[in-house]
Structure formats: structure tokens, C-alpha cells
Amino acid sequence: IGQNGKPFKMYKFRSMYMDAEERKAELMAQNKMGDSRMFKLDFDPRVIGNKILPDGRHKTGVGEFIRKTSLDEFPQFWNVLKGDMSLVGTRPILQDELEQYELHHRARIAIKPGITGMWQVSGRSDITDFEEVVRLDTEYISNWNFGLDIKILLQTVKTVLKREGSV
């Protein structure tokens, strides 16, 4: 979902199995975010190559590498060129997430979603409170200026290179 709730096709390199959305329901109890307005797992078996071994250890695969290095986001530059996304903005959301939003959450769709944003450079996977994500996004919207975008872009490069807070 893009700016003002307009649906768009977001391009990404596939890092998850084709049935990832169908398998989401069975994993909802493990959601670090606590509800279904946003979904994150410590170890996601829907990621290509990820397996839980018989002894309980986790084995990661190529999909995890693609996600940790943020390579899966690279095709979103096409969305920026098409005008659906911005380099910096709020996190893009799914339709089923939007349907569960309260009024104050909808501020996140007032601007174009971005490839990166305040949430991504402020802890990414370490943030497990949806209201904190909303707070960071609304703070970005309220304080937006060109300098803030440059700061976030530079911080994004640092975050990606150091793989800080990556999924």
C-alpha cells in the first residue's frame, strides 16, 4: 500500500518461499510485534533455505543472506523511478495490515513509502513495539526536510554495511 492508501506493486528479490503468506497464520503466535499489524520473527522458516534441524538448531540459507544484506530491497529503485516510492519514507505496508490500523496509525500512509526510513536506521529488527515504529514514522513525517533525508540515507549505508539490526 502506498501514499494515501493507493495499492501498488512493490518489486523485491524473492527471499521467501512462494507460500510464505499462507504460512504466516501458523506462525502468528511467534510474532515479535505482538499483533498482526506488523509481523517479525527471530527465525523465519518461510525464508528460502532456512531450516530447523532435528536437534533444534537453526540453519540459514541464501534467503537469509539476501535479507541480511538488504539485497532483496534493490528492485525497489524501480518503484522509485515509477513514482510509487521514495528513497526515504515510511515502511510500505500490506493491505491486511492497513485493515487493522487505528486512525493514528494511518498517518504512516500520508507520504510515499520509502526504501529506507527512520524506523530502518533506528534499530530495524531490534524494535518489537509497533507503536514505536508508528512514532518513528510520524516523527519523520512531522520533521521532514532534505537534510533529514540525507542523514537517513547516510545512516542507511552504514547500517547495511555493518548489517546492524538486519532481519
Predicted feature locations:
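Conserved small/aromatic sequence motifs within transmembrane helices
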Residues: I1-V167
